[in-house]
Amino acid sequence: MSRVTIDPITRIEGHLRIDVEVDQGHVQKAWASSTMFRGIEKILVGRDPREAWLFTQRFCGVCTTVHALASVRAVEDALNLEIPLNAQYIRNLILIAHALHDHIVHFYHLSALDWVDVTQVLKADPKKASSVAESLSDWTGNSTKQMEAVKNRVKGLVESGQLGPFAHGYWGHPAMKLSPEVNLIAVSHYLQALDYQRYANQVVAMLGGKTPHIQNVAVGGVQNAINVDSSATLNVDRLVEMKLLLEKVVGFVQNVYVPDVCAVAGFYPEWFGYGKGVT
């Protein structure tokens, strides 16, 4: 019996450690643990509490905004402050835009490659893949032409020997169950998701000053100038622009993300029972 420790686990949000006991190549027991302490807690000691949100959002480069707002709310609660309604609206818009970005990135760009075999795309029939995708939703990005373009792109990467973001995967592993066509759909949507997560992040940056790590929050509200007649501030034109960006992202989530999650999950029903934990 040997013990293997993997720390840290990559392609996740946060910190994760896995310990496993292996006997003749078979995992007998496994433990998952997360490191809660990051060290920023020590940095904050003795500092002005109004600065805390600037530091705490550095916990993560993906889920940054929620740490900033949780921190500033903690200070506001301690001071018994109520923020203006417009400030709450702006914070809410930042949070929802960030949540949309975060879910898209987490599924497609962090988690999906544990379930999707990129190299199997080379065996896929683009026409069949398009037919399967169109049976799930009426998304315009599911055409045969789109699937052919993605297959050719992956073929070029494989033939070059430089897989880029798809390097070092467990390609060909028997635990991967998706058909070649579903793999092609997933990779196609992986690439499309790069654009849609960016649209959501644009909204965060437009309101927060930049992303990652927004700059507009303050204890007691936000630091956004609002003037409907000035192009240099938050005005109606900017709000309309953000609305259009969010509508694009919502369309992708409803017609691509949700069907993809359900489709991939359907190939791995046994995983719903894993990870129950030990006592």
Predicted regions and their residues:
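Active-site bordering "gate/hinge" segments
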Residues: 1-279
